[in-house]
Design a protein with these regions (language model features):
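SAM-dependent methyltransferase catalytic region
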Residues: 2-269
């Protein structure tokens, strides 16, 4: 007979997103604790700007993470909405379907992270799979979009994000790390392509992959583009965090900030 070890993990149920190692220099996962701090700040700012309204009890608010990796922001948003909408939508399955199909959206940064984000949000890498908690999707992607994008090379760098051609022009077998949200001249058309219709968002929140190796090109060009596009697809009457309409983003202190994102101090430790 086997004897029970002196130590035990019985009763411990760790959050799997605290246990996953980072994958690459732009796939550094946001800790759930930090994501929740950002969401707390967001909810407080929303209440201040909307006469004390509870963000998590509003079934009309739409959220977007334009650079989702582990899906932690989307998962925690969905969890808060599930609690906040319990009175207005008492049936749990109806409530979950409403939140996941009409309120929470993401854009994966790589194929692998898009699957991980779907697993975090839908409990299945296939949004329409038999194990998915959402029952209203016809596609495997659900509301977390990913398709391979290509950089537009100009003088050795990407015209949109500044990434180094020497570093990332490496063939079809490897990820390009070209993010759909910023590799476009028309963000409204891109959002319509991804999610359909005249889609706009009330909250755009995420942790951009500032660690991406861009061959020494640390001017923050793509961050400025990200912030500009956030403004373009956000509703006008929405929360502002550190001067960025509807966008809760953060950047590390060493980054210089171009004129287009001069207000984006972000939420930092």
């Amino acid at each position: 007979m086997m004897e029970q070890a002196a130590f035990t993990l019985r009763g411990r149920n760790p959050d799997v997103l605290t246990c996953i190692a980072n994958l690459s220099n732009d796939e550094v996962f946001t800790p759930p604790e930090f994501a929740n701090r950002m969401l707390d700040t967001l909810a407080a700012a929303w209440a201040k700007d909307n006469v004390g309204a509870n963000l998590w009890a509003d079934k009309s608010v739409k959220f977007l993470d334009p650079c989702t990796k582990s899906g932690v922001f989307l998962r925690e948003i969905a969890s808060r909405l599930t609690q906040g909408l319990a009175v207005e939508i008492p049936d749990l399955q109806e409530r979950v379907d409403h939140i996941l199909t009409k309120q929470v959206f993401g854009i994966g940064i790589t194929h692998l992270t898009s699957l991980l984000a779907r697993r975090s949000l839908y409990c299945s890498k296939h949004a329409n799979g038999k194990h998915s908690i959402a029952k209203g999707f016809a596609s495997e992607a659900g509301n977390i979009w990913f398709e391979r994008m290509e950089h537009t090379w100009l003088d050795g760098k990407c015209a949109f994000c500044g990434a180094s051609q020497k570093t990332l022009d490496r063939g079809e077998e490897l990820e390009t790390h070209a993010y759909a949200f910023i590799h476009t001249d028309d963000i409204r058309a891109r959002i319509a392509e991804l999610f359909g219709g005249n889609m706009q968002f009330d909250v755009i929140i995420g942790n951009p992959p500032y660690q991406l190796d861009d061959g020494g090109y640390r001017s923050g060009v793509w961050v400025g583009c990200l912030v500009g596009w956030c403004r373009a697809v956000a509703r006008h009457s929405t929360v502002c965090i550190d001067g960025v309409p509807s966008a809760a983003t953060w950047r590390p202190l060493p980054w210089p900030c171009p004129k287009s994102c001069s207000a984006v101090g972000g939420l930092m430790r």
